[in-house]
Amino acid sequence: MAFANRSRIEQTVEALAQFNATPGAGITRLSYTTEYRAAQAYLKQELEAAGLSVRLDSMGNLIGRKEGTDRSLAAIAVGSHLDSVRNGGKYDGAMGIICG
């Protein structure tokens, strides 16, 4: 059974929080902005390093895929968002991505 690595989760939350248009005033990472695209590039690199195949769909969604070992079993899908509201919290969206 796999267990969550708390330190790695915290490091990734902090790394994503750096892609922010409003330092010192919460996290602002609006869709398709410079901050959003930089966070997306960072996340793409992390997913590839974890062994996932990664692609962007026609709407700009980043999709990571890891094949299972038993094709007779149903697929598992998880999702979240990388953008934020203005001056949001650093966990908004990030935790869903990281823990997914």
Model segments located where?
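Alpha-helical metal-binding/catalytic segments enriched in His/Glu/Asp
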Residues: 78, 88-100
